[in-house]
From Swiss-Prot:
Cofactors demanded by this protein: pyridoxal 5'-phosphate
Name used for this protein in its record: Glutamate-1-semialdehyde 2,1-aminomutase
Residues where N6-(pyridoxal phosphate)lysine is found: K265
This protein's pathway: Porphyrin-containing compound metabolism; protoporphyrin-IX biosynthesis; 5-aminolevulinate from L-glutamyl-tRNA(Glu): step 2/2
Xref: Gene3D superfamilies: Aspartate Aminotransferase, domain 1, Type I PLP-dependent aspartate aminotransferase-like (Major domain)
Keyword Ligase: no
Organism: Escherichia coli O139:H28 (strain E24377A / ETEC)
Subunit structure: Homodimer.
Subcellular location: Cytoplasm
Keywords for the protein's UniProt record, in alphabetical order: Cytoplasm, Isomerase, Porphyrin biosynthesis, Pyridoxal phosphate
Reaction(s) catalysed by this chain's protein: (S)-4-amino-5-oxopentanoate = 5-aminolevulinate
Amino acid sequence: MSKSENLYSAARELIPGGVNSPVRAFTGVGGTPLFIEKADGAYLYDVDGKAYIDYVGSWGPMVLGHNHPAIRNAVIEAAERGLSFGAPTEMEVKMAQLVTELVPTMDMVRMVNSGTEATMSAIRLARGFTGRDKIIKFEGCYHGHADCLLVKAGSGALTLGQPNSPGVPADFAKHTLTCTYNDLASVRAAFEQYPQEIACIIVEPVAGNMNCVPPLPEFLPGLRALCDEFGALLIIDEVMTGFRVALAGAQDYYGVEPDLTCLGKIIGGGMPVGAFGGRRDVMDALAPTGPVYQAGTLSGNPIAMAAGFACLNEVAQPGVHETLDELTSRLAEGLLEAAEEAGIPLVVNHVGGMFGIFFTDAESVTCYQDVMACDVERFKRFFHMMLDEGVYLAPSAFEAGFMSVAHSMEDINNTIDAARRVFAKL
């Protein structure tokens, strides 16, 4: 047995499923998950000594690559001053200033510890601000594991085939209205059925938890217009897309202005950080200035703030997003060319530093139904054959891939060459 296999066997006796987040268990592809010893740049190194070109990037945060010196040094320096104070720090103020400068729609921001905390808090705030209970989300979109959001969810919920989680009371779920991504008619129908009851829409601007599904041109502006028409708030969940699709996020890339924005992943530079923010009048409803309660022992943790501040300063440098786009575009083009040579039907969606691989005869993939019609079994074989080639993709047909600026064009070309060999045998 490999060392990964031995560790996985031991882990399953101690940790449910052997992992601390379900998708890591390789449930969606079969086999034994890799146990990682270290990472550097664009590469992961497992406990058995094998190196992999990494397109998971810790599920999105590692936009600069692993073990970036600026982030590492910031963490070391901050740790020397103490790990947690439970009191305000200067770095929290500097971090808030930077985030609100980079994302102009955020007049104010509240730091939390995860993307899930960000989305659940933003929804509570929207409900408190509007005095309404119902929310709209979209099939296949994932906004963390809060009860009200585990209804027809994406990410690991899709991987496990359980988009509606046991343990979520029907009384909670009844306030969550699920519409079809990229289908404005379904959203209007929900508003017309409950014109005075919907507090907010929460949406991934690029649906990255049913692989990678970009919005149709009219979709996000249409959501903004419907929220304005019916008095609801628009929450854009940029946990995945923030600082990756563009410096000011997908909202800037697609030209839509939300009332609230949720952030995570990149904002922490690899540390556990989330944030939510937006219009000043809405954020003023948050405790301690307003009645909507939210709190966290480790929110604004000095180590995490130092990591995030260093990361965002690097991400804001000229050329970062152009590099991400160039590398991702080259990978997408190369995969499509290699698949066509082998007669393999393939769609590759990509936006900025995100991409999605779909084995399908369809010309495009634009919604949940399109994603579910793809050939998952072929993806499973592709995943394991690419892993054997030293390429680490997301171990699920329903998760996006992530590029970093640490990837080189040589890494991209080596990945395409590996895919060409795999397609020939697939």
